[in-house]
A protein has these predicted regions:
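Oxyanion-hole/transition-state-stabilizing segment in secreted/luminal serine hydrolases
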Residues: 37-53, 62-100, 124-128
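A short helix->loop->beta-strand "cap" motif at the edges of active sites that frequently abuts
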Residues: 114-118
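Cell-envelope and extracellular/periplasmic
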Residues: 55-58, 80-94, 104, 108-111, ...
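Conserved beta-strand scaffold positions in the cores of enzyme catalytic domains, especially
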Residues: 31, 52-54, 156
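Charged helix-capping and loop-helix junction motifs
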Residues: 96-106, 134-141
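N-terminal secretory targeting modules
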Residues: 1-31, 37, 41-48, 150, ...
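Catalytic His-Asp segment of secreted/periplasmic serine-dependent ester chemistry enzymes
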Residues: 126-208
Length: 208
């Protein structure tokens, strides 16, 4: 949006340069998004992909995902892009419609630049810290899931089922004290299996 400060230019430059120095081509799977992915230090293990590229950055919002799509995604020509972003938009007061619109712009930009690419979007998590804004989270996820149905190589994965218990309460043991970010068990038990399955599905659809 107009007037937004570009907070992460330096971090993005360092991240992309570091990856260019070490990645093997072609890149099969690339993660991009906010701190939920940035803090997923065990992603390569949990997703069983030793060559995984993780470009989670800062406390990024969806407009920043669009802003840096070339440097963080397109320049690496991945086969599958896994995205998590939107949590910080909710905290900043963005509407569900605005969040979903920017996610769709991101997906379309990636698809236009990389024909045949697979995209996995991981649902915004219904964190305890956002309890009073779960309605916005739910609406944003519904809109993004609908957007994912528009593309043959897009998969929406809802991790929230695994983050809630049988009483429909958040599994607080999976969260850090801030009620927003995750402990390693959440990535190992919830994100890993769900995202692996989604990657397999999108690869199958990409192969036709």
């Amino acid at each position: 949006p107009a007037g937004q400060e570009k907070r992460y230019a330096a971090e993005v430059e360092v991240l992309s340069a570091r990856s260019r120095a070490v990645v093997r081509e072609p890149v099969e799977t690339l993660l991009v998004g906010s701190s939920i992915f940035r803090l997923w230090s065990s992603a390569a293990t949990d997703l069983r992909d030793a060559d995984l590229v993780n470009h989670g950055f800062g406390g990024s919002r969806t407009w920043e995902l669009v802003e840096y799509v070339e440097e963080l995604v397109v320049d690496f020509s991945p086969e599958v892009v896994v995205c998590y972003c939107g949590s910080n938009d909710v905290n900043a007061g963005a509407s569900a419609a605005a969040i979903a619109r920017r996610v769709e712009i991101f997906m379309k930009t990636v698809e236009d630049a990389l024909p045949g690419v697979g995209i996995v979007y991981v649902a915004i998590n219904r964190a305890p810290q956002k309890r009073d804004r779960w309605a916005i989270v739910d609406e944003a996820n519904q809109r993004i899931e609908k957007a994912c149905r528009k593309g043959p190589n897009r998969v929406f994965v809802d991790v929230n089922e695994g983050l809630f218990d049988a009483r429909d309460s958040p599994r607080t043991e999976l969260y850090l004290e801030d009620g927003l970010h995750f402990r390693p068990a959440a990535y190992r038990e919830v994100f890993g299996p769900a995202v692996r399955n989604a990657i397999e599905r999108v690869r199958a659809s990409s192969r036709g």
